[in-house]
Amino acid sequence: MDFGKLFQSIEDAVYEVMVWILLLPKTLIRSMFRPRWTIQYVNEEWEKQPDDRFDEYLSPVLLWLIVAVLPLTASTIWRNGNIKSLQDLVSALHDGLLSQALYAMIIPFTYIVWMEWMGTRPVKKSTLKRSFYIHCYALAPAQFIYSLFAILTLWNDFFIYFLPLSSLLLVIYEVFVFRTELKIPFGKALLYAIVPQLVLGPLLLWLIRFYISPM
């Protein structure tokens, strides 16, 4: 075993986590209170080389994973209560992160497909990736609020009634995205942002029933 490479890997990992911790608050606050900035920031970073992108703020996907997927995974593991050893925890985290990422992907995927369908631009791999990044920034605050109340529900079922607030916030943030990306007026953007809720609304109701039902 090359201990030099091992220590270097540990050093790089510790440094990377420290950077994430430092950049997380300002990235989340910016995306929460300045949604137009997130779209502009992604467009500006898209002009750079891939290795030079998202140096000042967390990348959209990483922000989305930290504030949406990770808290939901933690709340699900805690709710199940089947962790009896460190190995159980590691296994639950591995499986939980994958499943929660797939569940959380439904929201940006629905909006991306809907936006591309309503737009006039040709669908390309590069444009889809940029759109995914924009939606990750736009949806992170709403999914963070949902994750927060999902965790608080573990202590008091009263907080479950705040879960629909995330859908309202989601629509608000998506209005900014539709207005900027499709160059449409507010009323039309609001309509476009609401329509996908016909798909996502039943999913939210199912999740609320999941949290209400006894384990």
Question: Which residues are covered by each model-predicted region?
Answer:
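Short amphipathic alpha-helical segments, especially helix-boundary/capping motifs
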Residues: 9-18, 89-91, 150-154
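Selected alpha-helical membrane-embedding segments in polytopic membrane proteins
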Residues: 20-126
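Hydrophobic alpha-helical transmembrane segments and adjacent short intramembrane/lumenal linkers
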Residues: 101, 107-212
